[in-house]
């Protein structure tokens, strides 16, 4: 810290009167005070430094509160604006994870936050607010408590209290402490507080984004689905084998940081000798291997289980880095007994070097047809498919069953499929499968359930139950939140398909790291910042350049901005949100977008400007 900043902090200390002061002192008293100061011990000096930092931060909080009082009406009425004028600010980021980054990706892969499915701030945190003050206000006593906690922790650290005066460390500590306090408040809030809130008028509907209004050539979604960014020197590998449900098999296993559902494509780079040797030993063209999800919590009665999917390789290519690029497709759900694992399983995204085997059991998929379709009405069955006779035919069917019509329709998946089809029309997706089993997995990937519901749908063996869970979420309006600081980033209604596989796709970067990416037309105002320079190198979408985007509040990597570089290519601009950096939560109608951290934003902005 330079002399000007140090002088600033000492000046702020003057703003807070010392306890016990009686007024001005004469020269003799001042000389005595100076002499006394020179003789203080090390403990008193450390206490003085603590007081300087604490007083400085308290003064910033006071100024932030005054600014809040002036801006409160505007903040309560706004949605998505944080009152910031620093649109061009580019937050510093020590760990940047980009679509084409190399060493940064390897470092990012080692962090639990990139792989957590149960990180601080669950899927319901966004709907828990204190009903008494406005939802965007954080009480000053919590900010004061955060300051005290930060100073106490710094005092016990090796750097001591002086470590707080480093600009980057200072800002990071404020973020960390305030975020932890906010998450603790969300987890410990009583459930009754949320239920006692009076009903609120829902916000006006947002205007949908229609890419058809853009003039130009529509991007070919087959290019992204084929993962053409690895080149055109790949060859098809024959064979798609489904294993018998309930059977047990011995196979090669890897780990993965995301949940895969059957039907998803998993691209990856790996040492080719691991796969080629396995193919030669088994005499298989399209090798089947297992992928486990260690961060998906098993049921409480079976804690020693690892759930995953079988994957089969269907295409092979060369990456040019002594690694081989493979494309595989998830086929069936599996369960692994951890006691049967032979060797140390490794993550498939981290260039595994060792083989690991285990027995895996293929999980069943139970599907019950709709009750009314199981009733044979004899010669009257010919009227079933006549639209004008359908209602009358249904009434005749009901008379032959002991169940009322509502009970039969409750387990009808046709209505769920039709509602889902209408909701997905805005995403421009026309690849909905017809098989109920494949359809249930496809809807999970494209309707974007919360992580808790995703685990529930994966663990259930009943296709009907899976569709019922999906149907219960069709009316909810959801938002992408930053996994690190809980700031809202984008509306799920702005999702669209840049791949023929849907709105959520797995992509592999040049370093071998696999990203689960959600493509959206737009993000919220003032939600993101940028890091690095845009580039077209190794772009997942040919004809587009990518640029790393960071959460504007916590400066963590949350995805990429893609901008068309070829003329007349549409959409001209869109965003890819990294699944490891975002979570899905319900939209809170009575809370301004990004408003829960309004006070903290003002504080951090003021701290940053004061320390520039």
Curated annotation (Swiss-Prot):
Bias-annotated ranges (Basic and acidic residues): 181-190
CDD domains, A to Z: CRBN_C_like
Domain of life: Eukaryota
GO BP: protein ubiquitination
Cell location: Nucleus
Quaternary data: Likely a component of a DCX (DDB1-CUL4-X-box) protein ligase complex. May interact with pic/DDB1.
Family the entry assigns: Belongs to the CRBN family.
Name of this chain's protein: Protein cereblon
Annotated organism of origin: Drosophila willistoni (Fruit fly)
């Amino acid at each position: 810290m330079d002399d000007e900043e140090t002088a600033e902090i000492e000046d702020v200390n003057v703003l807070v009167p010392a306890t016990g002061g009686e007024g001005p002192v004469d020269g003799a008293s001042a000389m005595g005070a100076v002499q006394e100061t020179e003789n203080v011990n090390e403990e008193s000096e450390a206490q003085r430094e603590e007081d300087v930092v604490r007083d400085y931060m308290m003064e910033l909080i006071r100024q932030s509160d005054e600014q809040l009082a002036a801006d409160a009406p505007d903040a309560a009425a706004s949605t998505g604006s944080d009152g910031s004028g620093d649109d061009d600010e580019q937050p510093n980021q020590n760990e940047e994870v980009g679509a084409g980054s190399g060493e940064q990706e390897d470092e990012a892969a080692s962090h639990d936050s990139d792989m957590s499915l149960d990180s601080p701030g669950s899927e319901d945190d966004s709907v828990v607010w204190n009903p008494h003050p406005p939802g965007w206000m954080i009480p000053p006593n919590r900010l004061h408590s955060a300051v005290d906690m930060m100073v106490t922790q710094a005092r016990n650290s090796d750097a001591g209290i002086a470590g707080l005066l480093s600009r980057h460390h200072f800002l990071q500590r404020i973020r960390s402490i305030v975020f932890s306090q906010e998450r603790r408040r969300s987890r410990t809030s009583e459930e009754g507080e949320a239920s006692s809130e009076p009903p609120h008028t829902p916000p006006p509907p947002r205007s949908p984004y229609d890419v058809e209004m853009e003039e130009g050539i529509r991007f070919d979604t087959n290019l992204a689905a084929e993962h053409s960014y690895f080149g055109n020197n790949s060859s098809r590998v024959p064979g798609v084998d489904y294993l018998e449900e309930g059977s047990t098999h011995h196979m090669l296993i890897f780990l993965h940081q995301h949940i895969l559902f059957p039907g998803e494509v998993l691209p990856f780079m790996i040492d080719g000798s691991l796969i080629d040797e396995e193919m030669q030993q088994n005499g298989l063209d399209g090798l089947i291997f297992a992928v486990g999800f260690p961060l998906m919590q098993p049921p409480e009665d079976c804690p020693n289980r690892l759930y995953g999917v079988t994957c089969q390789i269907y295409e092979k290519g060369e990456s040019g880095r002594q690694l081989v690029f493979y494309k595989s497709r998830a086929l069936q759900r599996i369960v692994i007994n951890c006691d049967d694992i032979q060797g140390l399983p490794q993550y498939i995204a981290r260039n595994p070097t060792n083989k690991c085997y285990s027995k895996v059991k293929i999980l069943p998929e139970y599907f019950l047809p709709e009750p009314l379709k199981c009733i044979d009405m004899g010669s009257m069955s010919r009227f079933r498919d006549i639209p004008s006779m359908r209602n009358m035919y249904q009434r005749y069917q009901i008379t032959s069953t002991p169940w009322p019509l509502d009970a039969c329709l409750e387990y009808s998946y046709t209505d769920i499929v039709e509602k889902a089809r209408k909701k997905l029309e805005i995403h421009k997706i026309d690849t909905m499968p017809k098989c109920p089993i494949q359809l249930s997995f496809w809807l999970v990937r494209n309707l974007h359930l919360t992580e808790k519901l995703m685990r529930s749908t994966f663990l259930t063996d009943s296709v009907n139950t899976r569709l019922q869970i999906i149907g219960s979420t069709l009316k909810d309006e959801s938002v992408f939140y930053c996994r690190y600081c809980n700031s809202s980033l984008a509306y799920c209604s702005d999702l669209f398909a840049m791949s023929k596989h849907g709105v959520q796709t797995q992509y592999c970067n040049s370093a071998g790291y696999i990203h689960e990416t959600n493509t959206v037309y737009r993000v919220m105002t003032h939600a993101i910042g940028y890091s690095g320079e845009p580039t077209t190198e190794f772009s997942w979408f040919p004809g587009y350049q990518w640029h790393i985007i960071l959460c504007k509040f916590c400066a963590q990597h949350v995805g990429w901005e893609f901008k068309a570089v070829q003329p007349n290519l549409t959409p001209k601009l869109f965003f890819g949100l990294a699944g490891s950096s975002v979570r899905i939560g319900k939209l809170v109608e009575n809370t301004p977008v990004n408003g829960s951290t309004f006070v903290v934003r003002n504080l951090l902005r003021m701290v940053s400007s004061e320390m520039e």
